[in-house]
């Protein structure tokens, strides 16, 4: 047994060593970030922790199924802070989220979303990326980078520690190598999935009254595209002839399918889609203010028919199965083809049916 004085000296020496080590590491962390950028993370369900950026976790930012807290942590090997502008509608923001997640992982950076994106996606999906506090957003020395809509070599070697992405990326070339992770991020909340499955479970084939064996989700994009495509992009939207061809493709390959139609132009669909075979149901509500209702229906189907747009892309990507899409829907000289590469937009195994461009060719004649 040491004498009391000797033990006290040893304890004091150990305490000084511990405090010195802690001070050294705190100094390193503080010097790694701009002056004034806080090191605290404010989470409603745990005490103070210290990653190198100030964020807060909004209620409902869930972690994985085995996690005990709703405030996600990034792996220690990641650094920096990346985020993305939440521009556009529902499908656009899904593309931005998936692209941010994939590029941040590829470059070894931490990814955060802004509150507006959380507000758009968290009520629908079990997303896990944490939310960047407005005060941290405003005090971070961002470099901004506008992405084009396909993966490029330079995106695999981005050195910026504080990067804010922008644009409307929605290409599988960014994130398809993480498909299972993306599907987990975009897992529907239980009540939305159960509600959609309940609707599908009540459907019957019109001619026989039997339960369908195969559900084919159909998304018909109309709305503002009716003006934007022909007037700005020299393009068309899906017409009744395309939808008939797409449905016939599935009828030839699947026994007793039912086509579950959703659209932001349901009246047009009811007037122009052939229902004579008793296998078409207009199940969507067409409300753009609550897109997740139609989206949930589409993702619970076995296969997909899409026209154009990111909403249809994501429904098809998450549903899996076969996908038929509208191909070559612009004239060859369309400016749209400078920002959109079909080979990067549609998975190679998806089936394209060419659009009817006759109305555009007529207008293009001198």
From Swiss-Prot:
GO terms for molecular function: alpha-(1,2)-fucosyltransferase activity; galactoside 2-alpha-L-fucosyltransferase activity. It catalyses: a beta-D-galactosyl-(1->4)-N-acetyl-beta-D-glucosaminyl derivative + GDP-beta-L-fucose = an alpha-L-Fuc-(1->2)-beta-D-Gal-(1->4)-beta-D-GlcNAc derivative + GDP + H(+); a ganglioside GA1 + GDP-beta-L-fucose = a ganglioside Fuc-GA1 + GDP + H(+); a beta-D-Gal-(1->3)-beta-D-GlcNAc-(1->3)-beta-D-Gal-(1->4)-beta-D-Glc-(1<->1')-Cer(d18:1(4E)) + GDP-beta-L-fucose = alpha-L-fucosyl-(1->2)- beta-D-galactosyl-(1->3)-N-acetyl-beta-D-glucosaminyl-(1->3)-beta-D-galactosyl-(1->4)-beta-D-glucosyl-(1<->1')-N-acylsphing-4-enine + GDP + H(+); a neolactoside nLc4Cer(d18:1(4E)) + GDP-beta-L-fucose = a neolactoside IV(2)-alpha-Fuc-nLc4Cer(d18:1(4E)) + GDP + H(+). Glycans are attached at residues 66, 302, 328. It is a single-pass type II membrane protein. Keywords: Glycoprotein, Glycosyltransferase, Golgi apparatus, Lipid metabolism, Membrane, Signal-anchor, Transferase, Transmembrane, Transmembrane helix. Catalyzes the transfer of L-fucose, from a guanosine diphosphate-beta-L-fucose, to the terminal galactose residue of glycoconjugates through an alpha(1,2) linkage leading to H antigen synthesis that is an intermediate substrate in the synthesis of ABO blood group antigens. H antigen is essential for maturation of the glomerular layer of the main olfactory bulb, in cell migration and early cell-cell contacts during tumor associated angiogenesis. Preferentially fucosylates soluble lactose and to a lesser extent fucosylates glycolipids gangliosides GA1 and GM1a. Belongs to the glycosyltransferase 11 family. This is Galactoside alpha-(1,2)-fucosyltransferase 1. It comes from Pan troglodytes (Chimpanzee).
């Amino acid at each position: 047994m040491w004498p009391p004085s000797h033990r006290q000296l040893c304890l004091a020496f150990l305490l000084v060593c511990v405090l010195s080590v802690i001070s050294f590491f705190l100094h390193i962390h503080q010097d790694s970030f701009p002056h004034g950028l806080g090191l605290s993370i404010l989470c409603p369900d745990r005490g103070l922790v210290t990653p190198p950026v100030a964020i807060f976790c909004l209620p409902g930012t869930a972690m994985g199924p085995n996690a005990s807290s709703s405030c996600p942590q990034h792996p220690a090997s990641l650094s920096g802070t990346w985020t993305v502008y939440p521009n556009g509608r529902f499908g656009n923001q899904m593309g931005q989220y998936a692209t941010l997640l994939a590029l941040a992982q590829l470059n070894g950076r931490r990814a955060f979303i802004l509150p507006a994106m959380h507000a758009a996606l968290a009520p629908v999906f079990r997303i896990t990326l944490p939310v960047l506090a407005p005060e941290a957003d405003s005090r971070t020395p961002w470099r901004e980078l506008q992405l084009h809509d396909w993966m490029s070599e330079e995106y695999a070697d981005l050195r910026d520690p504080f990067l804010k992405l922008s644009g409307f990326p929605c290409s599988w070339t960014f994130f398809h190598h993480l498909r299972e992770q993306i599907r987990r991020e975009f897992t529907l909340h239980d009540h939305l999935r159960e509600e959609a499955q309940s609707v599908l479970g009540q459907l019957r084939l019109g001619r026989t009254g039997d339960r369908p064996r195969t559900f084919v989700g159909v998304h018909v994009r109309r709305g503002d595209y009716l003006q934007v495509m022909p007037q700005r992009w020299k393009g068309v939207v899906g017409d009744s002839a395309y939808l008939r061809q797409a449905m016939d493709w599935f009828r030839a390959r699947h026994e007793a399918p039912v086509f579950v139609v959703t659209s932001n132009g349901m009246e047009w669909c009811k007037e122009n889609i052939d229902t004579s075979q008793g296998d078409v149901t207009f199940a969507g509500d067409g409300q753009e203010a609550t897109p997740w209702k139609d989206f949930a229906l589409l993702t619970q189907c076995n296969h997909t028919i899409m026209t154009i747009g990111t909403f249809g892309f994501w429904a098809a990507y998450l549903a899996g199965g076969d996908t038929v899409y509208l191909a070559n829907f612009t004239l060859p000289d369309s400016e749209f083809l400078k920002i959109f590469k079909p080979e990067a937009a549609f998975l190679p195994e998806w089936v394209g049916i060419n659009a009817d461009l006759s109305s555009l060719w007529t207008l293009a004649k001198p």
